[in-house]
UniProtKB/Swiss-Prot annotation:
Pfam families: Ldh_1_C, Ldh_1_N. NAD(+) binds at residues 11-17, 105, 112, 129-131. This is Malate dehydrogenase. It catalyses: (S)-malate + NAD(+) = oxaloacetate + NADH + H(+). Substrate binds at residues 92, 98, 131, 162. Belongs to the LDH/MDH superfamily. MDH type 2 family. InterPro entries: L-lactate/malate_DH (IPR001557), Lactate/malate_DH_C (IPR022383), Lactate/malate_DH_N (IPR001236), Lactate_DH/Glyco_Ohase_4_C (IPR015955), Malate_DH_AS (IPR001252), Malate_DH_type2 (IPR010945), NAD(P)-bd_dom_sf (IPR036291). GO terms for molecular function: L-malate dehydrogenase (NAD+) activity. Catalyzes the reversible oxidation of malate to oxaloacetate. GO terms for biological process: malate metabolic process; tricarboxylic acid cycle. Keywords: NAD, Oxidoreductase, Tricarboxylic acid cycle. Signal peptide: none annotated. The gene is mdh. The active site is at 187 (proton acceptor).
Length: 330
């Protein structure tokens, strides 16, 4: 057995973490020969619930789980970690504006960024799920200068999975036959699911689904509003699907990308090939090489419709950045 991989998870008593922790501990992500150490973070008043989750995980007797520790101090949770999965964040309450939510969560991600900076491995990879995840990720990044800026990601993999499902459903094929699905921009209602560059059975989407009106309206809006639809139907936000997408996002980053494919993740826009303003956490199509290096896929074409939508999501991210500019170290 190799040395254990240390993974920190914030929001450990929440529903996403509950759907995630057992799968991580089982070895699903890193395989049957890799030990795992889980370091789970929660706010003090949720530690009792988290203790119950810890007991359940212990009762599974996972052979690959080297240890599980729980705490309310990010400086303990993030010590010497290889990965941080930042799930915990304040949710939007009644009457709360997006600006209010950003301000509330900025405090959390300033603190967590500083803790990562102080005690995490400099090579640690950070995945932000807590919303608004793009700008929360930017805040954490700007408070962790000792970590590599290119190793901070906000999750748009759930949006990619949703888009993949809707395209497969419409074309009546398996989801495995849908590829090269890109989510551009923000993980919000302005996100842009790209049907122009996606493929179904290795063919351009529009040759299989020649209904431009459905693609421009029904498809895009269904992806953009899927989270809200789940809340309306279930009374709670996405949890198991978000956990599954987070595992997908980590797998995307860890393993080489198959030839001719790519995945979506939001990362720092500096030096991107599409003219998106720098200093944003923006979702792009990406690939990982055999040596583990991640790069943005270049050369994808935007038609006028796609370009207009992408400019809107870029503008929203610029506005979010401005809302928290007073606490960003830029």
């Amino acid at each position: 057995m190799s040395q254990p991989i240390k993974i920190a998870i914030s929001g450990g008593a929440g529903q996403i973490a509950y759907s995630l922790l057992f799968r991580l501990a089982s070895g699903e992500l890193f395989g049957p020969n890799q030990l795992i150490e889980l370091q789970v973070l929660e706010v003090p008043n949720a530690l009792s619930a988290l203790e119950g989750v810890k007991m359940e995980i212990e009762d599974c007797a996972f052979p690959l789980l080297s240890s599980i520790k729980i705490c309310s101090d990010p400086y303990q949770a993030f010590e010497d970690i290889d990965y941080a999965l930042l799930i915990g964040a304040k949710s939007r309450g009644p009457g709360m504006e997006r600006r209010d939510l950003l301000q509330e969560n900025s405090k959390i991600f300033v603190n967590q960024g500083q803790a990562l900076n102080a005690v995490a491995k400099s090579s640690a990879k950070i995945f932000v799920v807590g919303n608004p995840c793009n700008t929360n990720c930017l805040i954490a990044l700007n408070n962790a200068p000792s970590l590599k800026r290119e190793n901070f990601y906000a999750m748009t993999r759930l949006d990619q999975n949703r888009a993949t499902f809707f395209l497969s459903q419409k074309s009546q094929v398996s989801t495995k036959d849908v590829s090269c699905v890109t989510i551009w921009g923000n993980h919000s209602a302005t996100q842009v699911p790209d049907f122009v560059n996606a493929k179904i059975s290795q063919k351009p989407v529009e040759t299989i689904i020649p209904d431009r009106q459905w693609l421009e309206k029904d498809f895009i809006e269904s992806v953009q509003k899927r989270g809200a639809a789940i809340i309306q139907a279930r009374g709670k936000s996405s949890a198991a699907s978000a956990a599954s997408a987070l595992l997908d996002a980590m797998r995307d980053r860890i393993l080489p990308t198959p030839t001719g494919q790519w995945f979506s993740t939001a990362l720092l826009s500096d030096g991107n090939p599409y003219g998106i303003e720098e200093g944003l956490i923006f979702s792009f199509p990406c690939r990982v090489k055999k040596n583990g290096e991640l790069s943005i896929v270049s050369g994808l074409k935007w038609d006028a419709f796609l370009e207009e939508k992408i400019k809107l999501t870029e503008q929203e991210l610029k506005e979010e950045r401005e809302m928290v500019s007073s606490i960003l170290k830029i």
